């Protein structure tokens, strides 16, 4: 009877050690973390001259779902999007943001990246920008660069 308890105890300890050595790092690597973004005119391509600015948080989860919002000031935005392109380049819209007020925009519920878009995100090749009537191609921008 004493041997059975020792075997159970050893197996329990071995299971716990296995989780912390293997499972815990995997769980930590797959957790989503919000990216703080700071949008500015000098990140646009080509750069523009404006006093507008913006900030917010965009979260991309390992299941490829996207959430977040941005707030802008010093401009009258007409549209906001997440695009796919490297820093210094322009790219196609992949997620149109939803206007919440004159100064806030949010990622729509259920937004999700494709496998290829998620790889681009991991490589730092997604960006968010906000358009205006004065700057139809974009007035302020921030690259989404995961840590």
Spans of features found by a protein language model:
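Metal-centered catalytic cores of metalloenzymes
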Residues: 2-5, 22-80, 84-147
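Bacterial N-terminal signal peptides
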Residues: 12-24
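Bacterial N-terminal signal peptides that target proteins for export
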Residues: 2-15
